[in-house]
Amino acid sequence: MNVTDLKKVFKVKTLSKDEILFKEGETDGEGYKIETGTISLIKNNIRAEILGPGEVLGVWKVFFKNKGRFFTAVAEEKTNLIILPEKYLEEKVSKADPFIKHCFRSWLDLTRKFMMGSQ
């Protein structure tokens, strides 16, 4: 599916400023694509990143089979997101070429180790 078609198929969620999308450690597996607005990713009460339109968040659980969320995600302003269901993400990952999955997971694992080591 083309990225531009996502909002034709999936639900859109609107967050108000300072509304929490998800908390670190939560176990739901939905992903999100930001349509408008910005989301802060917070780890240990430190803002690690601010994401904006076109960026995707909340998908690490599916890619790594993690049990919980790595960050808390908070809207910096009114924000519209497309909800990417966990089953949809799992289906996409399961159909990916095994070599590409290996490369992607290796890169993400290295990134995650770096982030955890830099705290």
What are these regions (language model features)?
Residues 2-3, 22, 92:
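Residue-level detector of alpha-helix boundaries and kinks
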Residues 40, 47-49, 88-91, 98:
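Short, surface-exposed beta-strand-loop junctions and turns on beta-sheet-rich folds
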Residues 69, 89-119:
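A small-molecule sensor/coupling module
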Residues 11-77:
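Cyclic nucleotide-binding regulatory domains
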Residues 1-17, 81:
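Short proline/glycine- and basic residue-enriched helix-capping loop/turn segments at helix->loop/beta transitions
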Residues 1-5, 88, 99:
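Exposed alpha-helical structural elements
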